[in-house]
Amino acid sequence: MQFQTLLVVAGSLVASTLAVNSTVTEHHTTEITITHCSDNKCATSVAPAVQSVNTVTIEGVVTEYTTYCPLTASEHKHKESSSPSSVAPVASTESVVTTTISGVHTSYTTYCPLSGSSEASTVITPGTVAGESSSSSEEVSYVDVTSTPVVESTTDVELTLTAQSTLFTSYANSTGSSSSSSVVPSANVTTFEGGAVGGASNQITVGFAAIAGLAAILL
């Protein structure tokens, strides 16, 4: 049983592992699908875009104008460079949206950089928006996901104690010429599990008491 217990403990120690923290970062970007048709033929392309939001409130009516402008290679180049000498003018398209509410005329003008086949798409969405933004902005959001596996291990140890008492007896020969002694081991062998140490101590105490009694009789 002791060897089996040692094997169980060793197996538990080998199977236990440390918790590992892994971080996953997710980047979110906005992409638009551009469909260009010419001569009864249409071509579709996907490009990253920046979002421009204009919000107008007239007589309690909130109107949100969202414009997506596709990014071009020249825009990326200008954003990465910080020196003013690298900035060059870029051709752009002008998008004008005019609304009339209760006799009030409002015009919204948006400029988008001109690329080979890019066109600005405007989406009008009524709703309530907290703030107003009139310039194009690029938004990057990060999401951190942390996973911590939990490893649980349980170790059970079984304790076994064996106690054996030996009784010494002496007797006198009837002729009075000689005496002899003998050692008689008792056959009381007790096995304890867990914390049963008190029983072994009691049996050893009884053995010593028997020896003391025999010594008193002989004297």
Swiss-Prot record:
Specify the protein name: Predicted GPI-anchored protein 6
What superkingdom does the record give?
Eukaryota
Propeptide, residue positions: 195-219
Annotated organism of origin? Candida albicans (strain SC5314 / ATCC MYA-2876)
Q: What induces it?
A: Up-regulated by high iron, during biofilm development, and upon ALS2 depletion.
Function text: Probable cell wall protein that participates directly in adhesive cell-cell interactions.
Q: Which family does it belong to?
A: Belongs to the flocculin family.
**Entry membrane topology:** Lipid-anchor; GPI-anchor
